[in-house]
Amino acid sequence: MANKRTNRCLYKSDFKSFIEADPYSVLGRIHDAFHGQALTTTDEAWLEEIQLLRTILSPWKDEEAEIIFEYDIPRLGKRIDVVLLLRGIIFCLEFKVGQKHALQSDVEQVMDYALDLKNFHRYSHDRIIVPILIPTKHTSSSSSFTPSVYNDSIFNPLITGAIGLQKIIQEVLRHANANTSGTIQDWIISPYTPTPTIIEAARSLYENHSVEDITRHEADKVTTDVTIAYILDVINRSKIQGEKSICFVTGVPGAGKTLVGLDVAVKQSYQDDGTFSEEDGAVYLSGNGPLVAVLTEALARDNYKKSREKGEDKKLSDSRREVSKFIQIIHRYRDNMLAKIKNPVVNGELEIDPDKAVKLQQSGYGEVEHVAIFDEAQRAWTHKRIADYLKRGGTYGNKLKVPNFPMSEAAFLIWSLDQREDWATIVCLIGGGQEINTGEAGISEWIAALNERFPHWNVYISDKLTEHEYAEGRVNELLKHNQNVVFSDKLHLGVSLRSFRAERLSAFVHSLLSFNPDAAELYNDVVSHGYPIVLTRSMEKAREWLRQQARGTQQTGILISKVSARFKPLAVHVLPQSEDNAVHWFLEDKTDVRSSNYLEEAATEIQVQGLEVDFACVLWDADMRYDNGKWTFWKFKNTSKWTPKKHDIPKWVPEKNLENQKYMLNAYRVLITRARQGMVICIPEGNDRTTPEGFPEDSTRLPSFYDSTYGYFKSLGINEI
């Protein structure tokens, strides 16, 4: 039974087949399952682990037991080096090949794996789990074999070198009185299922933290409560009638869409008396990595701080784990469903492979949650983008390859919920005109999927989606032949007393970018209601204005489009793309140089969508220029570092692709709606100096690249500082 086909790991075998196999044959099987090119050091580590374990596991060679290499914990994005399923016990092995000493961070890593299995892995809930750290050159071994004080059947982490691992396993089996041979059936394809314990902790964590602090807190509670109540009613009707339904929630930036999504995720999971409902759970999913990272870290830090103040012995990693019940990155949800399909796809139809998934009575082959909330659903990928991505196995070729994927991401997400055999509801949170990256499909792709593939789904949508930002204003037209559509104004987060600034700012931004004649009037309206918008041509003045505006712990930051190129002369650097960087940029205070408040690193639309600061500087580069009543779009063509050609110098060139032009326009739409309290727009003067020979000193920053845009803003009466 060596290496039965699965997408959950790189290698799986019974002990006997593994021990009798040639080590290089096992390594070859791991290579075959690995997507991408393994590093030499990774190869060497795998080979040493294989050779060690063939000897170490020999006492149990003839038992019914399994070994698994590189196991992916469903939907958590974590991978365990080696799992042993022996006598009903789960051993989590974390190897540090060539390492002599045990590090605290490594101990915490292997313990986290054990906790993740206990809390989220259905077939591990009621099992003994033993985390073992193995720095291979370590010369001593743990001598205490006890379950943790939390009475959860998890052993305290054990530490041993390679030479002591066999004895450690023997001692664990003796202490656990594990005398009967046996593995755990279907453990490798266990469904993702959070325990009631982790869900209750997550609920407490969420309810004791004001999410408005980190999402969009111009939202009006009356307005959002009406929308939340409507969605919960749709969910309840779907449950009672055994139907599949989808709700589209729309609204201006700052109207509270993310807040609505998180509230629905929590409230749907509990009955009116506050008890957890295992069958009615919901999950909030977003493809926005920085948003998920910042939300998760903010909630976790707050919970950790409050727990410590109460004298509780709690780790920050525990709080993060609790948050992950309700808030997850959408790609892991998607990948978990992809792991269940027959591959390659035949005749353009997705099918579940019963060898790769467990069918449950209620959820069928779907995920455990009846309700999935997709934030920023307009950013779901087109068929072309996701098909290309899966064909090459991800960005770097290191993920599951599906060579002929037949549908868009929106269609696949609906298909995933459609696998449930009872009922399901999808909630799509839609930002109009906020598709900002190549291959982001917008609301029209969701509607197309419903019309063409899922006509049996009920569709609930606002009747106000006539603006150009929503499927070019064609929402009603696209749905006119769908017989299952219900229109309701309760699904659009619109004007309210507390969100007037967000609503007015959104109207001004729409007119500004569309050259509507009321833009100047709307600007005055925004400013007169306490939201300052000022203009400058100097980054120093912009920084000074931000520092003067911010009081107490109010946050400032510089924002820039990802296509921008000529910002270094202004002493601005772009924040490197990583979720950790986004967390530090948003959450650290004014004493930390990684904080946005230092006004040194600028975040792009990719990093700030769905989040905001109090006061922002939007640095407007030459990538989008005003020209006689229209926008022109430019991309920066850099020189080839290794093969320079004559006349091949860095320069701006026109962006002619209409799709890319739309993304560039939407990028600025996102950037100038990120500030809660006010913003300064900096349009540089450029460089008008010439060389002694009369040539421009910097031909990439000519004043003409900026002056017309500056003139347009001035014509609207925007106050200059």
Predicted regions, residues:
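N-terminal pre-P-loop "Q-motif" helix
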Residues: 213-245
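Conserved helicase/translocase motor-coupling segment
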Residues: 261, 436-442, 451, 457-628
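Conserved lysine of the Walker
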Residues: 257
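C-terminal accessory regions
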Residues: 422-425, 598-721
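Accessory nucleic-acid engagement/destabilization modules that flank
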Residues: 1-194
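Conserved RecA-like ASCE ATPase "motif II neighborhood" in helicase/translocase motors
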Residues: 317-417, 600-604, 667
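Hydrophobic anchor at the beta1->P-loop junction of P-loop NTPases
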Residues: 249
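Signature of the SF2 helicase/ATPase Hel1-core->accessory helical subdomain module
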Residues: 373-477
